[in-house]
Design a protein with these regions (language model features):
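Catalytic cores of DNA base-excision repair glycosylases
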Residues: 2-179
């Protein structure tokens, strides 16, 4: 639900699901796509997001009998591969699920990561997701808490300073450029 929206909107959608006792897999799985869409309306693109959430629920039910813990307990490589085969889950979402739900070391690359690293001259502007992810995975120790903190700090710096119109003079990374 976090794609293309502010976190405050996602929080409203989650609160709505919680108020309706729908933060449980069985309840969410039983809910129709249209009912789910109405409940997550505040997160934007709610019809597409409902379709994607329902696709995930259907996959989890069909392949794992609804056992999220068992699904998430797979090794990193096979779990990432399976996640990427589910409708609506791309690399960033797969890596977010691995890092924050399965607690497995998989570095999340997002718009802020690309923007910060490009503006500082550390990577090419046209670097692809997998190439930048591989760079982090090769250079950093595979530690879940470290990856979570690193990602959170990049998101914070991106949100506060490295926007489309940047605030470079105030950025804590100011001066840390290639060359």
């Amino acid at each position: 639900m976090t794609q293309n929206t502010a976190w405050k909107n996602v929080k409203q959608s989650i609160a709505c699901l919680r108020r309706n006792n729908l933060l449980d897999f069985e309840a969410l799985h039983r809910l129709s796509e249209s009912e789910l869409a109405l409940l997550i309306r505040s997160s934007g693109y709610y019809n597409q997001k409902a379709r994607k959430l329902k696709a995930f629920c259907e996959h989890l039910q069909t392949r794992w009998q609804g056992d999220l813990s068992l699904f998430l307990s797979q090794e990193t490589g096979p779990l990432r591969k399976e996640l990427l085969q589910i409708y609506g889950i791309g690399p960033e979402t797969a890596d977010s699920i691995l890092l924050y739900a399965a607690f497995q070391p998989s570095f999340v690359v997002d718009t802020y990561t690309c923007r910060i690293f490009h503006r500082h001259g550390w990577v090419a502007e046209d670097i692809g997701y997998d190439e930048l992810r591989d760079y982090f995975m090769d250079c950093l120790e595979p530690d879940v808490e470290y990856f979570q903190e690193y990602h959170a700090l990049l998101v914070r710096a991106g949100h506060l300073y490295c926007r489309r119109k940047p605030f470079c003079d105030f950025c804590p990374l100011n001066g840390w450029t290639e060359g």
